[in-house]
């Protein structure tokens, strides 16, 4: 594992995952999150942004995810950019906020995973990267995991 110019450890791969629940009729918006050195390049490759929107950290951009042919618009999206080290994982993180329908999410996620240098995240891997990069301690990671896996609010 190498370090960036800012001293943040750099893991060699970029991970992606759907960060919101996706089920028929359960949500209007879904979030696909990427973290790692290729996050920006992947999203820039599959997305077109009208006008002259600046790609700045902690800003939202409006655009469309394009099919592999570069012409068909798969979905209208908002893209949130969080550059290292000012993100949950302390890596470059880019979120694609797309429509929440199952088909739309599958199509956008498939485009993300088609790109070289990106793979599907393992369960808990975003938190693992946050721990490895000093953004989260193990106690807080365990509490987050517990809250995410409880079936009801009554058990909190």
Where is each model-derived feature located?
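A glycine-rich (often HGG/GG-containing) alpha/beta subdomain
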Residues: 1-148, 154
